[in-house]
C-alpha cells in the first residue's frame, strides 16, 4: 500500500518525504521531472520505494498500476510567478492536475494537492471564497482554475480531496528554485556573499522593506499535510500560512541576527542594521509593479475548524532554524 508524492524532488515535496520517513513510512513512490539533474540531491537522503518520471506516471496511475494507494500528495507544478508562457503553465499546472484528480476520484485515492495564495492577487481578504479570488498572473490563474474544478467535484466525491493554499513558504531544500526561492533564503545568501542584505524599496504605499507577507516554515506545511492524511474524512480547500503578516524588514533582520547569534554576536535593531550597512534598499522593479502581492495574511478559520490545532513557528524561530541548516549545508 503505497503513498505517492509528485514534485518529490522539489522544495515542499522533498520535505514531505522527510516527514513521512520520520513516521517510518518508506513505501513511497516519488514522482518528478529530473531534467534538472541536480535536484536529485533533494531525494538522496530519502527512503523511497520507487521513482517515476511525471509523464510516465500519469498513464500508469490512471490504469491503476500501483494497487492500493493510501494517498496521493500532488506537490508538482511550475511555481514561477514570473512564467509568461500561459500554454505551458496551464498544461503543467491545470491539465496535469485535472487528470490526476479524475484518476484519484475513480480509484478512490485520497488526493491532497498544493494550491497557492497567489489566487488572491492584490486583495486584502484572504478567505477561501470565490469573491476574494483575483489572481494577478497566469501562475495564480492556473491554481485558481484548478481550485474551481475541485469545488465542482467535491459534492460528488466519494474519497478525500484537499487543497492547501500555501502562503510564503521558506526552509530547507529550496535552493534549486533560484529567483523563486524565499526571501529568507535570498537574504542569507546575500549576507554570506556581499556582507549585506538588500530589499525592495517603497512601492504601493508601503515603505522600504515594509511589504507584508505571511511567511510559513516548510516544517509546518508538512505537518498540516500529514494532519489531513491522518483524517481522510475531511475534504475542502484550506489556507496554509502562519496567520500573521510580517514585513520583509523583519525577515532580513531575523536572518542577520540568526547569523550573528551563530557567531556569538549580539542582536541588532532594524535601525542599527540599516545604520551599520548590513541592510539596504534598491528601487522597486518596474516589471513587478502590476503583478506584485504587497500584502498577504492567511485566514486560518477553516483550517482550525478542520481540526488542526498545532501552533505555527514564529518567524524568528523558523528563520533561526533555517539559518542553522543553511550553515551546516554550506
From Swiss-Prot:
<feature type="binding site">
    <location>
        <position position="292"/>
    </location>
    <ligand>
        <name>substrate</name>
    </ligand>
</feature>
<feature type="binding site">
    <location>
        <position position="143"/>
    </location>
    <ligand>
        <name>NADP(+)</name>
    </ligand>
</feature>
<dbReference type="GO" id="GO:0009244">
    <property type="term" value="P:lipopolysaccharide core region biosynthetic process"/>
</dbReference>
<feature type="binding site">
    <location>
        <begin position="75"/>
        <end position="79"/>
    </location>
    <ligand>
        <name>NADP(+)</name>
    </ligand>
</feature>
<feature type="binding site">
    <location>
        <position position="39"/>
    </location>
    <ligand>
        <name>NADP(+)</name>
    </ligand>
</feature>
<dbReference type="InterPro" id="IPR001509">
    <property type="entry name" value="Epimerase_deHydtase"/>
</dbReference>
<protein>
    <recommendedName>
        <fullName>ADP-L-glycero-D-manno-heptose-6-epimerase</fullName>
        <ecNumber>5.1.3.20</ecNumber>
    </recommendedName>
</protein>
<comment type="pathway">
    <text>Bacterial outer membrane biogenesis; LPS core biosynthesis.</text>
</comment>
<feature type="binding site">
    <location>
        <position position="168"/>
    </location>
    <ligand>
        <name>substrate</name>
    </ligand>
</feature>
<feature type="binding site">
    <location>
        <begin position="32"/>
        <end position="33"/>
    </location>
    <ligand>
        <name>NADP(+)</name>
    </ligand>
</feature>
<comment type="pathway">
    <text>Nucleotide-sugar biosynthesis; ADP-L-glycero-beta-D-manno-heptose biosynthesis; ADP-L-glycero-beta-D-manno-heptose from D-glycero-beta-D-manno-heptose 7-phosphate: step 4/4.</text>
</comment>
<comment type="subunit">
    <text>Homopentamer.</text>
</comment>
<feature type="active site" description="Proton acceptor">
    <location>
        <position position="177"/>
    </location>
</feature>
<dbReference type="InterPro" id="IPR036291">
    <property type="entry name" value="NAD(P)-bd_dom_sf"/>
</dbReference>
<keyword id="KW-0413">Isomerase</keyword>
<keyword id="KW-0521">NADP</keyword>
<feature type="binding site">
    <location>
        <position position="54"/>
    </location>
    <ligand>
        <name>NADP(+)</name>
    </ligand>
</feature>
<feature type="binding site">
    <location>
        <position position="213"/>
    </location>
    <ligand>
        <name>substrate</name>
    </ligand>
</feature>
<dbReference type="GO" id="GO:0097171">
    <property type="term" value="P:ADP-L-glycero-beta-D-manno-heptose biosynthetic process"/>
</dbReference>
<dbReference type="Pfam" id="PF01370">
    <property type="entry name" value="Epimerase"/>
</dbReference>
<feature type="binding site">
    <location>
        <position position="169"/>
    </location>
    <ligand>
        <name>NADP(+)</name>
    </ligand>
</feature>
<feature type="binding site">
    <location>
        <begin position="11"/>
        <end position="12"/>
    </location>
    <ligand>
        <name>NADP(+)</name>
    </ligand>
</feature>
<feature type="binding site">
    <location>
        <position position="179"/>
    </location>
    <ligand>
        <name>substrate</name>
    </ligand>
</feature>
<dbReference type="GO" id="GO:0050661">
    <property type="term" value="F:NADP binding"/>
</dbReference>
<feature type="binding site">
    <location>
        <position position="186"/>
    </location>
    <ligand>
        <name>substrate</name>
    </ligand>
</feature>
<dbReference type="InterPro" id="IPR011912">
    <property type="entry name" value="Heptose_epim"/>
</dbReference>
<feature type="active site" description="Proton acceptor">
    <location>
        <position position="139"/>
    </location>
</feature>
<feature type="binding site">
    <location>
        <begin position="200"/>
        <end position="203"/>
    </location>
    <ligand>
        <name>substrate</name>
    </ligand>
</feature>
<comment type="function">
    <text>Catalyzes the interconversion between ADP-D-glycero-beta-D-manno-heptose and ADP-L-glycero-beta-D-manno-heptose via an epimerization at carbon 6 of the heptose.</text>
</comment>
<feature type="binding site">
    <location>
        <position position="177"/>
    </location>
    <ligand>
        <name>NADP(+)</name>
    </ligand>
</feature>
<feature type="binding site">
    <location>
        <position position="92"/>
    </location>
    <ligand>
        <name>NADP(+)</name>
    </ligand>
</feature>
<comment type="similarity">
    <text>Belongs to the NAD(P)-dependent epimerase/dehydratase family. HldD subfamily.</text>
</comment>
<keyword id="KW-0119">Carbohydrate metabolism</keyword>
<dbReference type="GO" id="GO:0008712">
    <property type="term" value="F:ADP-glyceromanno-heptose 6-epimerase activity"/>
</dbReference>
Amino acid at each position: 500500500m503505497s503513498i505517492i508524492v509528485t514534485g518529490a524532488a522539489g522544495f515542499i515535496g522533498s520535505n514531505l518525504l522527510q516527514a513521512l520517513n520520520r513516521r517510518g513510512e518508506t513505501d513511497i513512490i516519488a514522482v518528478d521531472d529530473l531534467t534538472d539533474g541536480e535536484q536529485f540531491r533533494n531525494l538522496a537522503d530519502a527512503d523511497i520505494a520507487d521513482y517515476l518520471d511525471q509523464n510516465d506516471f500519469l498513464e500508469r496511475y490512471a490504469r491503476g498500476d500501483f494497487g492500493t494507494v493510501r494517498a496521493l500528495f500532488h506537490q508538482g507544478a511550475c511555481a514561477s510567478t514570473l512564467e509568461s508562457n500561459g500554454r505551458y503553465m496551464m498544461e503543467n499546472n491545470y491539465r496535469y492536475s485535472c487528470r490526476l484528480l479524475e484518476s484519484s476520484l475513480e480509484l478512490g485515492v485520497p488526493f491532497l494537492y498544493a494550491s497557492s495564495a497567489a489566487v488572491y492577487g492584490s486583495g486584502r481578504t484572504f478567505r477561501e471564497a470565490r469573491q476574494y479570488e483575483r489572481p494577478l498572473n497566469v501562475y495564480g490563474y492556473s491554481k485558481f482554475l484548478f481550485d474551481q474544478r475541485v469545488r465542482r467535484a467535491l459534492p460528488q466525491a466519494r474519497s478525500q480531496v484537499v487543497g492547501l493554499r500555501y502562503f510564503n513558504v521558506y526552509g530547507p531544500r529550496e535552493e534549486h528554485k533560484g529567483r523563486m526561492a524565499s526571501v529568507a533564503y535570498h537574504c542569507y545568501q546575500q549576507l554570506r556573499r556581499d556582507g549585506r542584505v538588500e530589499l525592495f524599496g517603497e512601492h504601493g504605499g508601503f515603505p522600504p522593506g515594509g511589504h507584508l507577507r505571511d511567511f510559513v516554515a516548510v516544517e509546518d506545511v508538512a505537518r498540516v499535510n500529514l494532519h489531513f492524511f491522518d483524517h481522510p474524512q475531511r475534504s475542502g480547500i484550506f489556507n496554509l500560512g502562519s496567520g500573521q503578516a510580517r514585513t520583509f524588514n523583519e525577515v532580513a533582520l531575523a536572518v542577520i541576527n540568526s547569523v550573528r547569534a551563530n557567531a556569538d554576536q549580539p542582536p541588532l535593531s532594524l535601525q542599527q542594521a540599516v545604520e551599520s550597512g548590513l541592510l539596504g534598499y534598491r528601487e522597486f522593479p518596474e516589471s513587478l509593479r502590476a503583478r506584485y502581492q504587497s500584502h498577504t495574511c492567511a485566514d486560518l478559520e477553516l483550517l482550525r475548524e478542520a481540526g488542526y490545532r498545532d501552533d505555527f513557528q514564529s518567524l524568528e524561530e523558523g528563520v533561526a532554524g533555517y539559518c542553522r541548516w543553511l550553515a551546516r549545508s554550506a
